[in-house]
Structures are given as structure tokens and as C-alpha cells.
A protein has these predicted regions:
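Low-complexity, intrinsically disordered or signal/transmembrane-proximal segments
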Residues: 1-3, 23
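Conserved short alpha-helical segments that host acidic/polar catalytic motifs at enzyme active sites
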Residues: 27-217
């Protein structure tokens, strides 16, 4: 019976689940260009479940030890993206059942945030939500970009306006500045620009993308 319970609760064997948490890279050193944010966050994604937001809520509970500063969930209901986020623990952010019930749809991404600096501001709580004339996008990120400072400076010179002090936004701005024809190629090109350890979840109206750094962060 004990073995059956363990097998039933093994997340990797359940299709549709994309749990990512940060793993420490022991025995290796890295020269950091900037240490403005040292995030130890947790991200969770699911696609094709009738109660995607509810499952993500429990997924974030299991990742609560990864971050206690803030939490949020973004859902996808037939191409319509909706989000709820706030400062505090998962149970505090979603203490009103209506906030979770309003996140309808069969896909969702979630994030619990921890940061040693950068300010306890709701602007830094993920998932981030971007709405443009031609697309909507949700973004959740765990990691530390070692070239964040230079990329941010480059993007600001091109006219990008950042709404948070987190380096998470950098990927979105790189995607928007890319001259590749389709979104997947834009994403691939942008991921080649960022350096460091990272895990991303990117929600589009019709797809959910997951990206991991080349070193297996």
C-alpha cells in the first residue's frame, strides 16, 4: 500500500504537469555580473486539466518552502488569460475562494517568490502578464540571470520600459525586439541571449512553453 501511494503521488508520471524548482549547483563557481536579485522561487505549470488553477494552487503549496514573499496564478480559458497575485503566502493570497474560482480554464502557471533584495512590491510578484496588440503572454521565472544588468541597459536604450525591478521581464522584452517571424523562433533567439541559471514557463493563448538553462538548472 505504501508503494502504491508513493507511485500515485509521483508528479513526473502524471501527464500535463511541469513542476520546476531551483537546484543548487554545488562544486561550481560562476562570475556574476550583478547580484541584484538572488531568487529561490518555485514555478508550476499544467495544461489540459479542467481544474488547472486549483491544481496549480496545491502545486504552489508544495513549493511554498521555495518562497514566502508572494504568490500568483495565471490561467488560460480558451485563449483568455486571467491572473491573481499578491504579497504573502499561498493561503493568504487566495484566502478568498472567489479569487481562485475566477481563474477558469484548462491551463495555468503559478509562482511563489523569494528574493533577498529588490523590494517587497507586488510589481515583482509573478506570474507576469503582458497584453499587446497582437498577443497576450504570461511569464513565470525561477533563477538568476548573470547578464541581467547589461541586457536591461541595452533594452532600455531601445525604448523598453520595465514595470518591475526583477530580471524576469528581460525575456519578454527580448522576445518583442526579436525580428524572427514566429513566436517560437523569437523565444529561442531570446533564450540564447540570457545567461545564468533559469527555468521559465511562458503561457500563450494556445500554448505553454517550458525552458531550462543549458546546464540543467
Amino acid at each position: 500500500q505504501e508503494q502504491a501511494i508513493k507511485k500515485e503521488s509521483a508528479w513526473p508520471e502524471r501527464p500535463g504537469f511541469l513542476p520546476f524548482t531551483r537546484q543548487k549547483n554545488l562544486g561550481k563557481t560562476m562570475t556574476y555580473e550583478v547580484k541584484s536579485l538572488n531568487e529561490e522561487c518555485g514555478i508550476f505549470g499544467i495544461w489540459g486539466h479542467s481544474q488547472a488553477a486549483q491544481v496549480t494552487y496545491f502545486g504552489l503549496h508544495s513549493l511554498q518552502h521555495r518562497g514566502q514573499e508572494g504568490a500568483g496564478i495565471l490561467s488560460n480559458d480558451h485563449g483568455k488569460l486571467k491572473r491573481h497575485r499578491d504579497l504573502g503566502l499561498v493561503a493568504e493570497v487566495f484566502k478568498n475562494p472567489a479569487d481562485l474560482d475566477n481563474l477558469t480554464g484548462e491551463a495555468a502557471i503559478g509562482h511563489v517568490r523569494y528574493a533577498t533584495s529588490g523590494g517587497a512590491s507586488i510589481n515583482n510578484v509573478q506570474p507576469f502578464f503582458f497584453s499587446f496588440y497582437d498577443m497576450q503572454m504570461g511569464l513565470a521565472h525561477n533563477g538568476n540571470l548573470t547578464n541581467a544588468h547589461s541586457l536591461r541597459r541595452e533594452l532600455e536604450k531601445k525604448g523598453s520600459i520595465f514595470a518591475s525591478s526583477s530580471d524576469t521581464e528581460i525575456l519578454m522584452h527580448l522576445i518583442r525586439h526579436s525580428e524572427q517571424e514566429n513566436f517560437l523562433d523569437k523565444l529561442k533567439e531570446s533564450l540564447r541571449r540570457v545567461q545564468g541559471g533559469f527555468a521559465y514557463l511562458i503561457m500563450r493563448e494556445d500554448k505553454l512553453y517550458a525552458a531550462l538553462d543549458p546546464n540543467g538548472f
